[in-house]
């Protein structure tokens, strides 16, 4: 087992090295260097998902995930999209029952930009009322697509059967 309480940890296996650090506020940083690659990926995982929502706030985590791409106090939605598109990168996010993850893939030379942009989105987002209406439609479309997926339908039915109407049982 990994000594998860240590602030710094390194594991090496051939050319691959994984480092783990815990920053002052408890943020965990995992890095993996693979020398043969010229690309980089970064993910910011927030330990909040649909299981943390009550009946009145159901869906709010997914909604917030979408809204964080709408801009920050320093960047517009277009600035965020162009930051990744202009370097041939990509960014996206996902909301699950137990986490929300924001991620990007870029060339290794653009990693600092990706980290800075994602961190700005997560820590300094500008939530605008006009964006709520637009994203509501986008999310409803996503939910409808999920209903067309037999795998998603079965998974959601299983979670509901196992967990009942508790938050973790809801999609």
Locate predicted features.
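His/Glu-rich zincin catalytic helix
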Residues: 1-80, 106, 116
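Acidic/histidine-enriched segments that form metal/cofactor-coordinating
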Residues: 1-2, 6, 72-73, 79-171
């Amino acid at each position: 087992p990994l000594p998860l309480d240590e602030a710094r940890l390194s594991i090496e296996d051939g050319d691959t090295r994984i480092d783990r650090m815990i920053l002052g506020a408890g943020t965990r940083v995992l890095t993996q260097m693979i020398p043969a690659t010229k690309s980089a990926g970064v993910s910011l995982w927030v330990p909040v998902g649909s299981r943390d929502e009550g009946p009145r706030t159901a869906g709010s985590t997914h909604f917030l995930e979408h809204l964080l791409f709408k801009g920050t106090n320093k960047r517009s939605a277009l600035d965020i999209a162009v930051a990744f598109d202009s370097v041939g990168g990509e960014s996206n996010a996902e909301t699950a029952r137990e986490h929300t993850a924001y991620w990007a893939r870029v060339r290794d030379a653009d990693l600092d930009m990706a980290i800075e942009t994602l961190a700005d989105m997560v820590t300094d987002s500008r939530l605008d009322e006009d964006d709520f209406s637009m994203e509501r439609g986008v999310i409803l479309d996503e939910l409808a697509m999920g209903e067309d997926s037999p795998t998603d339908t079965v998974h959601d039915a299983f979670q509901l059967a196992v967990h009942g109407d508790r938050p973790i049982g809801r999609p």
